[in-house]
Design a protein with these regions (language model features):
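Glycine-rich phosphate/diphosphate-binding loop of Rossmann-like nucleotide-binding domains
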Residues: 46-59, 142-223, 351-360
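Cys/His-enriched microdomains
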Residues: 320-323, 328, 352-355
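Cys/His-rich microdomains that often coordinate metals
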Residues: 329-334, 361
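Positively charged, low-complexity intrinsically disordered leader regions
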Residues: 1-54, 58
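Short linker/helix segments within small regulatory modules
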Residues: 338-352
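Phosphate/diphosphate ligand-binding glycine-rich loop within oxidoreductases
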Residues: 34-141, 268-271
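Rossmann-like adenosine-cofactor binding region
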Residues: 197-274, 279
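Adenosine-phosphate binding glycine-rich loop
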Residues: 257-258, 263-308
Length: 362
């Protein structure tokens, strides 16, 4: 059963197909309002969400389907100690497709091992958020008409910013893409993202501490909030919160056709005065998310012709039950019954990573 955990679980051709379907839905929504009749989507949201959960629900309802689910760990049996595996085994009998969000990294990987229906990662901690990236890509497609030859600034929380990690992964497929990474040292991009997606694909990138310095270079600015819920030290959060604020003055430094994106919610990192700037596209971005999720649901339920096939990725070697991950945000640490599995691409037994959270074993 196919699951979408990482944006790279979809090939570039499949993403192009989803964009074409999403554009057709936007142009002719009446064609699609019965295609998921008698189908049920389960939204398993163990972490708060506004846009992603409502977007998935609106997507399924607009396709003529039905929705069941919950919107917090305190409203399901997780609060009683039920494991992800058991939750998924139960929901298998109730739904045709699952969208799952969880605060722990790698939780959807565990879920995918137990699901009998297609499962979509709707965000796992500070790890990945592939369907937000689909929304980002449709917005970029509408605004720029291409994914090639773009300079993209990523600003704010790059360490825990799952949307940033997924967007970088997606852009490895395209030509002459450059990233400008704008963050404080404490919130710089995780090493696995640098190694796998930037260095691993040969993408150009530079690290920068100043938003003002970066602005004139950018075709796209992707702002993110500093995520209070990811910090274990409140004093560190208070020190870093508000370090980058996009306002009219900074917008005056940007190209006339630059595009500002944000996965939302925002706190104080984009001044409301920017909302009226025609380059601000973050609310359009949320609208795009619904249509890309509609297209993805249809694809996973076999309602779109399989004219484009997934790419065959290099298979790693797996190491079972030898190591334990030490990442406190990893699902394998939080649920001790989750089997320890590490992966390596080194035949000589070199560096290996947890399959759930991508943390490298030192």
């Amino acid at each position: 059963m196919r699951s979408i955990i990482n944006i790279l679980d979809l090939s570039a051709g499949e993403i192009d197909q989803l964009i074409a379907v999403a554009d057709d839905i936007m142009a002719q929504p009446e064609k699609y309002n019965e295609v998921c009749r008698h189908k049920i989507l389960a939204t398993l949201f163990f972490e708060p969400s506004t846009r992603t959960r409502l977007s998935f629900e609106s997507a399924m309802l607009s396709l003529g389907g039905q929705v069941i689910g919950f919107s917090g760990a305190d409203s399901c049996s997780a609060v009683k100690g039920e494991t992800i595996a058991d939750t998924i085994e139960v929901v298998n009998g109730y739904a045709d497709i699952i969208a799952m969000r969880h605060p722990k990294e790698g939780a959807p990987v565990v879920a995918s091992m137990h699901t009998a229906v297609p499962l979509i990662n709707a965000g796992d901690g500070g790890h990945f958020h592939p369907t937000q990236t689909l929304a980002d890509l449709l917005t970029i497609h509408h605004e720029k008409g291409t994914f090639d030859n773009l300079t993209i600034g990523l600003c704010g929380d790059l360490k825990y910013g799952r949307t940033v990690h997924s967007l970088i992964a997606a852009m490895t497929r395209y030509k002459n893409v450059k990233f400008v990474l704008i963050s404080p040292e404490e919130l710089r991009l995780p090493q696995f993202v640098i190694d796998d997606y930037l260095e691993g694909s040969g993408l150009q990138y530079e690290e920068c501490r100043s938003l003002e310095e970066a602005m004139p270079k950018l075709d796209i600015l992707y702002m993110t909030r500093i995520q209070h819920e990811r910090f274990t030290d409140d004093a560190e959060y208070q020190r870093l919160n508000g370090i980058y604020v996009l306002d009219k003055e900074k917008m005056s430094l940007a190209k006339s056709d630059m595009c500002v994106l944000h996965p939302l919610p925002r706190v104080n990192e984009i001044s409301p005065e920017v909302d009226s700037d025609p380059r601000a596209k973050y609310f359009e971005q949320t609208r795009c998310g619904k249509f890309m999720r509609m297209a993805l649901i249809m694809k996973l339920l076999g309602l779109i012709p399989n004219e484009v096939q997934p790419e065959k990725a290099e298979e790693p070697q797996y190491i079972y039950d030898k190591y334990r991950c030490d990442n406190r945000a990893c699902i394998s640490v939080c649920e001790p019954d989750v089997r320890s599995i590490f992966k390596t691409f080194d035949a000589n037994g070199g560096a290996c990573r947890c399959i759930y959270c991508d943390k490298e074993r030192k």
